[in-house]
């Protein structure tokens, strides 16, 4: 049915409106100036018409708006200055690759899974204001994303778990990121090809480093200076990280409660580094490996 002429000027909530439908109408003329909630509006649809002129200045919630859709239309001029929730906005939107570099993201708090499995997206978003974002978990998981995001303000972020999981193209410079508030880095570079310098990252608030470099066959950076005094989980951290060969014996592992299979399959780790790591980590009763053999005088 043609609903292009509907008077929507008083509508405040359009959440889930067309979710899971086959509807693909012309909505370009709709007055959306009063709408505050657009979450899941077109999720799981074939929606792809022109909505470039929509007034989104009042919208605060766009989470999962285009999740699992065919959408790939121009929304570059949207006013996103009031949006706080962009969680999953383009989740599994495999066609989307539009220029959204000019979006005002200064109010955004959640970018969780925003581009999860959005395999086409590779636009420059280096200028985004991310100073209010607290959750970037899964943001670029399963993507081909690799633009420069070195200047992002990550000072408020607490959760980066699985942020680049299976993001096999990503290897940009993020050495200067402020990670001082991050508590969770679980699986951050799991099954990725990342090998950037993150030696200066402040991980003093992190409690979970499990799976961080699992199955990452490229990573081999010096992270010996990390403050790991609050970390409680290191299980699977370097599991099958076949290129990693660094001495991290200076790490404080006094709070770690699980090292399970931390280095299983880390075939690149030298015997000398195994010895050094063992001599420090062995003071923790939960240490997983019997690597004393690598410290024998005959080695």
Regions found by a protein language model. Give the residues of each.
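Negatively charged
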Residues: 1-299
């Amino acid at each position: 049915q043609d609903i292009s002429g509907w008077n929507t000027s008083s509508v405040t909530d359009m959440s889930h409106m067309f979710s899971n439908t086959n509807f693909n109408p012309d909505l370009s003329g709709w007055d959306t100036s009063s709408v505050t909630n657009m979450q899941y509006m077109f999720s799981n649809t074939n929606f792809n018409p022109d909505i470039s002129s929509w007034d989104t200045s009042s919208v605060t919630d766009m989470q999962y708006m285009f999740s699992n859709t065919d959408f790939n239309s121009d929304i570059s001029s949207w006013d996103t200055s009031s949006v706080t929730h962009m969680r999953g906005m383009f989740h599994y939107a495999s066609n989307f690759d539009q220029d959204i570099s000019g979006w005002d993201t200064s109010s955004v708090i959640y970018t969780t899974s925003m581009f999860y499995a959005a395999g086409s997206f590779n636009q420059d978003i280096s200028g985004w204001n991310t100073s209010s974002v607290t959750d970037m978990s899964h943001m670029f998981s399963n993507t081909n994303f690799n633009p420069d995001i070195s200047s992002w303000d990550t000072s408020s972020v607490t959760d980066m778990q699985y942020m680049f999981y299976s993001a096999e193209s990503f290897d940009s410079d993020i050495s200067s990121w402020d990670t001082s508030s991050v508590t969770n880095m679980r699986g951050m570079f799991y099954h990725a090809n990342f090998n950037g310098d993150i030696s200066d990252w402040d991980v003093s608030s992190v409690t979970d480093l499990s799976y961080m470099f699992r199955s990452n066959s490229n990573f081999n950076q010096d992270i010996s200076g990390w403050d790991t005094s609050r970390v409680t989980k290191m299980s699977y951290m370097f599991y099958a990280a076949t290129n990693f060969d660094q001495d991290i014996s200076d790490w404080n592992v006094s709070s770690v409660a699980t090292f399970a299979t931390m280095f299983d399959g880390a075939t690149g780790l030298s015997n000398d580094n195994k010895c050094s790591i063992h001599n420090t980590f062995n003071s923790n009763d939960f240490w997983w490996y019997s690597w004393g053999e690598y410290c024998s005088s005959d080695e």
